[in-house]
């Protein structure tokens, strides 16, 4: 799931806010560290929301924040947060897909290691679609 983050440079590093996840903040000494910490903060924050039976926040397009006056001096970007591990125990299902589509999925997975396998790919796409709806 892609979440927009707004990064502010401060004297001793970077502070990150996550506008689509109220109350979620992070920081880092370097820009890279701040972005990695933001991914972890979002995951932990959403895990807590699930434990409290709260509705999951929807992710808005990054364009919604780029031209906002309150983020004028911020770096606005997105981080990809895998939320599938928070969805509970995996259940095996049997699906039917056209051969060409399956071939294209396999080709895509081969060049995108963040998708571990077909199941992970389909789970992440379904999660992203349902949380963006």
Curated annotation (Swiss-Prot):
Which domain of life does this protein belong to? Viruses
Q: Which InterPro entries match?
A: HicB-like, TA_system_antitoxin, TTHA1013/TTHA0281-like
Family affiliation: To E.coli ydcQ.
Protein's recorded name: Uncharacterized 14.9 kDa protein in rep-hol intergenic region
Q: What is the lineage of its organism?
A: Viruses, Duplodnaviria, Heunggongvirae, Uroviricota, Caudoviricetes
